[in-house]
Amino acid sequence: MNTATGVIALLVLATVIGCIEAEDTRADLQGGEAAEKVFRRSPTCIPSGQPCPYNENCCSKSCTYKENENGNTVQRCD
């Protein structure tokens, strides 16, 4: 087997292995097991004193308007 044939054989093997692995982690739009493999969300929350867009993102579950260092009123987690 010469060098060109060896390179072609390796490319074919790599393509086949890549397709098999891609099938295992394919996104499942129905929210099944494959979706759990691809999208892993860790429960995170915004700590106290940080800007908050929504109450549910704060660790304290509470967000109030406060004055910042520039004198502007912004929402911050309690």
Swiss-Prot record:
The UniProt keywords, alphabetically, are: Calcium channel impairing toxin, Cleavage on pair of basic residues, Disulfide bond, Ion channel impairing toxin, Knottin, Neurotoxin, Secreted, Signal, Toxin, Voltage-gated calcium channel impairing toxin, Voltage-gated sodium channel impairing toxin
What are the subcellular locations of this protein?
Answer: Secreted
Reading the lineage from the top rank, the first entry is Eukaryota
What does the record list as GO biological process?
A: defense response
Report the GO terms under cellular component: extracellular region
What residue range is the signal peptide?
1-22
Q: Which SUPFAM superfamilies match?
A: omega toxin-like
Disulfide pairs? Answer: C45-C59, C52-C63, C58-C77
Q: Return the annotated site residues (Critical for insecticidal activity).
A: P51, N68, R76
Q: What is its main location?
A: secreted
- Add the further remark from the entry: This toxin comes from a male specimen. It is observed that propeptide sequences coming from male specimen are identical but have only limited homology with the female paralogs, but the reason is unknown.
Report the sequence similarity comment from the record: Belongs to the neurotoxin 08 (Shiva) family. 01 (omega toxin) subfamily.
Protein name, per record: Omega-hexatoxin-Ar1e
